[in-house]
């Protein structure tokens, strides 16, 4: 809990400018948590900066969603591109590789995670 305000922003869009791909949309988020003495407007600006950074990264999912998708990738295969590779993503990969018969590769330059 926080004594200040908090905000979460979501963007759902497609690579195509004409229409949203409802089967494979791109979902990115941005959030910020305030604290005592921080104006709500500043908290909102911080969340907007985060979602803008995620959109400009060209990723298909943000790092918060990416770490939750790791177990699904382990079970069904595939690949995702995220804005950054976090320690939580690495931890999820490590655990999945220990429990399941799966191996992951990470393209550190492009922030792409995939099963092999």
Annotate each predicted stretch with a short phrase:
Residues 1-116:
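Core subunits and conserved enzymes of cellular information-processing
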């Amino acid at each position: 809990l926080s004594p200040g305000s908090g905000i979460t922003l979501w963007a759902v869009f497609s690579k195509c400018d004409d229409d949203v791909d409802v089967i494979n949309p791109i979902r990115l988020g941005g959030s910020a948590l305030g604290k005592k003495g921080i104006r709500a407007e500043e908290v909102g600006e911080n969340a907007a900066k985060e979602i803008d950074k995620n959109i400009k990264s060209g990723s298909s999912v943000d790092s918060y969603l990416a770490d939750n998708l790791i177990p699904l990738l382990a079970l069904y295969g595939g690949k995702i591109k995220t804005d950054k590779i976090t320690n939580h993503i690495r931890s999820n990969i490590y655990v999945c590789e220990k429990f399941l018969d799966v191996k992951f590769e990470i393209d550190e330059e492009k922030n792409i995670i995939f099963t092999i």
